[in-house]
Protein backbone atom coordinates (compact mmCIF):
# COMPACT_ATOMS: atom_id res chain seq x y z
CA UNK A 1 0.00 0.00 0.00
CA UNK A 2 1.35 3.42 -0.93
CA UNK A 3 1.14 6.38 1.38
CA UNK A 4 2.41 9.92 1.80
CA UNK A 5 3.60 11.15 5.19
CA UNK A 6 4.28 14.81 5.96
CA UNK A 7 6.52 15.36 8.99
CA UNK A 8 6.74 18.64 10.90
CA UNK A 9 9.98 19.39 12.73
CA UNK A 10 8.18 21.26 15.53
CA UNK A 11 5.61 18.53 16.17
CA UNK A 12 6.64 15.14 14.84
CA UNK A 13 10.44 14.92 15.07
CA UNK A 14 12.06 12.64 17.64
CA UNK A 15 14.85 14.04 19.85
CA UNK A 16 18.02 11.94 19.74
CA UNK A 17 20.99 12.13 22.17
CA UNK A 18 23.53 12.64 19.38
CA UNK A 19 25.01 16.09 20.13
CA UNK A 20 26.95 17.78 22.90
CA UNK A 21 24.91 19.63 25.54
CA UNK A 22 23.39 22.69 23.86
CA UNK A 23 23.13 21.12 20.41
CA UNK A 24 20.00 19.34 19.23
CA UNK A 25 19.45 16.41 16.90
CA UNK A 26 15.96 15.41 15.79
CA UNK A 27 14.95 12.46 13.63
CA UNK A 28 12.57 13.49 10.87
CA UNK A 29 12.53 10.12 9.14
CA UNK A 30 13.52 6.95 10.99
CA UNK A 31 12.69 3.23 11.33
CA UNK A 32 10.22 3.81 14.19
CA UNK A 33 7.88 5.56 11.76
CA UNK A 34 8.19 2.79 9.18
CA UNK A 35 11.13 4.09 7.11
CA UNK A 36 13.26 1.11 6.13
CA UNK A 37 15.48 2.48 3.37
CA UNK A 38 16.22 6.06 4.47
CA UNK A 39 16.80 8.17 7.56
CA UNK A 40 16.87 11.94 7.84
CA UNK A 41 17.97 13.91 10.89
CA UNK A 42 18.02 17.63 11.64
CA UNK A 43 21.18 18.80 13.46
CA UNK A 44 21.02 22.26 15.06
CA UNK A 45 24.54 22.90 16.34
CA UNK A 46 25.30 26.38 17.73
CA UNK A 47 28.82 27.83 17.90
CA UNK A 48 31.07 25.57 19.98
CA UNK A 49 28.77 22.54 19.81
CA UNK A 50 29.17 19.31 17.87
CA UNK A 51 27.51 16.03 17.06
CA UNK A 52 28.81 12.84 18.57
CA UNK A 53 31.29 10.95 16.41
CA UNK A 54 29.72 8.63 13.84
CA UNK A 55 30.92 5.73 11.71
CA UNK A 56 28.23 3.99 9.65
CA UNK A 57 28.54 0.85 7.53
CA UNK A 58 26.64 2.81 4.85
CA UNK A 59 27.00 6.01 2.86
CA UNK A 60 25.79 9.21 4.50
CA UNK A 61 24.94 12.64 3.12
CA UNK A 62 24.24 15.97 4.78
CA UNK A 63 23.00 19.27 3.39
CA UNK A 64 24.09 22.45 5.16
CA UNK A 65 20.89 24.45 5.60
CA UNK A 66 22.27 27.41 7.54
CA UNK A 67 25.53 28.65 8.99
CA UNK A 68 29.22 27.90 8.56
CA UNK A 69 30.31 24.73 10.32
CA UNK A 70 32.76 21.90 9.78
CA UNK A 71 32.82 18.20 9.10
CA UNK A 72 35.75 16.60 10.90
CA UNK A 73 37.44 13.41 9.70
CA UNK A 74 37.53 11.20 12.82
CA UNK A 75 40.55 9.27 11.55
CA UNK A 76 42.88 12.11 10.57
CA UNK A 77 41.39 14.99 12.56
CA UNK A 78 41.19 17.08 9.38
CA UNK A 79 38.41 19.68 9.57
CA UNK A 80 36.62 20.61 6.34
CA UNK A 81 34.80 23.97 6.47
CA UNK A 82 31.25 23.92 5.09
CA UNK A 83 28.59 26.58 4.66
CA UNK A 84 24.92 26.91 3.77
CA UNK A 85 24.12 25.47 0.37
CA UNK A 86 26.81 22.78 0.39
CA UNK A 87 26.41 19.00 0.51
CA UNK A 88 28.64 16.57 2.42
CA UNK A 89 29.11 13.01 1.13
CA UNK A 90 30.67 10.32 3.36
CA UNK A 91 31.70 6.87 2.18
CA UNK A 92 30.84 3.75 4.21
CA UNK A 93 32.87 3.38 7.43
CA UNK A 94 34.23 6.94 7.28
CA UNK A 95 34.32 8.30 10.84
CA UNK A 96 33.16 11.89 11.19
CA UNK A 97 31.73 14.60 13.42
CA UNK A 98 29.64 17.68 12.53
CA UNK A 99 30.58 20.99 14.20
CA UNK A 100 28.53 24.17 14.49
CA UNK A 101 27.57 26.86 14.08
CA UNK A 102 25.36 25.30 11.45
CA UNK A 103 22.16 23.42 10.74
CA UNK A 104 22.64 20.15 8.85
CA UNK A 105 19.98 17.80 7.46
CA UNK A 106 20.87 14.26 6.46
CA UNK A 107 22.07 10.90 7.66
CA UNK A 108 23.06 7.42 6.53
CA UNK A 109 21.18 5.41 3.95
CA UNK A 110 19.84 2.88 4.80
CA UNK A 111 19.22 3.87 8.42
CA UNK A 112 21.92 2.94 10.92
CA UNK A 113 20.13 1.16 13.81
CA UNK A 114 22.76 2.38 16.28
CA UNK A 115 21.45 5.95 15.92
CA UNK A 116 18.06 4.88 17.25
CA UNK A 117 19.10 2.25 19.81
CA UNK A 118 17.84 4.31 22.76
CA UNK A 119 14.36 4.76 21.27
CA UNK A 120 13.65 1.49 19.43
Regions found by a protein language model. Give the residues of each.
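Conserved hydrophobic/aromatic beta-strand scaffold that supports enzyme active sites
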Residues: 6, 27, 40-44, 61, ...
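A short, N-terminal "cap"/entry segment at the start of jelly-roll beta-barrel domains
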Residues: 1-37, 52, 117-120
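Short, charged/polar surface micro-motifs in flexible loops or helix N-caps
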Residues: 33-37, 46-49, 66-70, 110-113
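A structure-centric signal for secondary-structure junctions around beta-strands
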Residues: 37-39, 58, 101
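Ligand-binding loop in jelly-roll beta-barrel domains
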Residues: 83-86, 92-117
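A short beta-strand-loop-beta hairpin characteristic of the jelly-roll/cupin
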Residues: 54-84
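Conserved short histidine dyad/triad with adjacent acidic residue
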Residues: 26, 39-56
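Histidine-centered metal-chelating micro-motifs
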Residues: 49-52, 70, 77-78, 86-97
